């Protein structure tokens, strides 16, 4: 999905490409061809041979939105090789104080707490027109749950809830991670409510359907604006997807229980803007509770929106550093 986003936004770049496999020969050739003046790594992308080559060539290298945990190999007794690769970084911009302290334990002082640049990106969503006529037609001013970036394990919870607990007035939009035709048809055939696919929506009266399955990419961010509740997939097994996008719209969020590696998720769980579930029973209880308690939905949504607003500014801080130092 990251590469798809880069390609979609490729008008902002001269070239979009994959990094080579991290071998000395390949990265040496890659750097020779690209000849970068500055290199930015984001979050937790660490390629030892690439970093070592950047250091050898004395190319300014910065880590952006970095986040570190004590379980990482950098902080182990046997992590000398990986620690050595970190010396390529001229500066570390990290998300939190814990990351800064961990780097200091291995003698890196060139560290600033800047936060996560994704907050600045998602906040820009509100400045664009997010209205989609086909979504508005489908919603028809009814209560709607939007499930984004779902995997099979997420969809099992949704299917059971829709089939067994949903009233005729409830509406659902499901945006699967896997949009291969066989998977989409399997999902649709598992739902006993009236459903429609994005790819088959032409000439359909969308307000007559209860479930809308989006079998395309690139529209999820705008779709979230219509949600009363958002469920973000990946948190049960494969890795939690982006919860900042629904949060910026001020929507309560439900996720799976494997969220601990995602700072924004742990923060919003603690703040009570986000709720985690681990099984069908909890999923059912949470969705029913959110539907029945307007005050809970409103308060959770406000928490999420404020969280985005309180964490803006990382991009400008980093850009100022680049202008001043590089």
What name fits each language-model region?
Residues 89, 105-106, 220-301, 305-306:
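Catalytic binding pocket for nucleotide-activated donors in carbohydrate/polymer assembly enzymes
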Residues 3, 92-95, 171-178, 254:
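Short internal beta-strands
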Residues 27-33, 203-209, 218-228, 248:
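Short acidic alpha-helix that forms the nucleotide-activated donor recognition element
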Residues 311-326:
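C-terminal alpha-helical cap of glycosyltransferases
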Residues 1-7:
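Short, small-residue-biased leader/transition segments that mark boundaries at the very start
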Residues 128-201:
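Conserved catalytic-core segment of nucleotide-activated headgroup transferases in glycan assembly
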Residues 10-18, 185-214:
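Nucleotide-activated donor-binding/catalytic signature segment of Leloir-type glycosyltransferases, i.e.
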Residues 14, 18-25, 37-120:
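Active-site-proximal region of nucleotide-activated glycan assembly enzymes
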């Amino acid at each position: 999905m990251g590469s798809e986003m880069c390609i979609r936004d490729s008008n902002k770049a001269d070239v979009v490409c994959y990094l080579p496999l991290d071998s000395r020969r390949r990265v040496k050739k890659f750097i020779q061809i690209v000849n970068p003046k500055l290199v930015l790594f984001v979050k937790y992308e660490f390629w030892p041979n690439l970093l070592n080559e950047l250091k050898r060539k004395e190319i300014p290298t910065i880590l952006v939105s970095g986040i570190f945990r004590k379980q990482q190999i950098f902080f182990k007794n046997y992590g000398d090789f990986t620690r050595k690769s970190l010396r390529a970084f001229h500066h570390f911009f990290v998300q939190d104080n814990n990351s800064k302290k961990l780097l200091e334990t291995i003698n890196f002082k060139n560290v600033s707490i800047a936060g996560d640049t994704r907050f600045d990106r998602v906040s820009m969503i509100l400045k664009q027109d997010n209205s989609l006529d086909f979504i508005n037609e489908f919603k028809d001013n009814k209560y709607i749950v939007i499930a984004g970036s779902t995997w099979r394990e997420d969809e099992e919870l949704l299917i059971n809830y829709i089939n067994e607990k949903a009233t005729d007035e409830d509406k659902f939009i499901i945006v699967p991670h896997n949009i291969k035709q066989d998977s989409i048809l399997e999902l649709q055939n598992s739902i006993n409510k009236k459903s429609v696919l994005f790819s088959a929506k032409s000439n359909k009266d969308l307000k007559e359907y209860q479930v809308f399955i989006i079998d395309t990419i690139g529209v999820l961010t705008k779709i979230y604006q219509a949600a009363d509740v958002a469920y973000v997939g990946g948190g049960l097994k494969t890795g939690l997807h982006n919860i900042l996008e629904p949060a910026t719209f001020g929507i309560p969020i439900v996720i799976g229980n494997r969220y601990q590696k995602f700072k924004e998720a742990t923060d919003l769980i603690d703040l009570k803007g986000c709720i985690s579930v681990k099984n069908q029973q909890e999923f059912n209880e949470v969705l029913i509770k959110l539907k029945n308690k307007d005050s809970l939905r409103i308060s959770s949504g406000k928490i999420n929106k404020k969280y985005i607003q309180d964490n803006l500014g990382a991009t400008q801080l980093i850009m100022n550093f680049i202008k001043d130092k590089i």
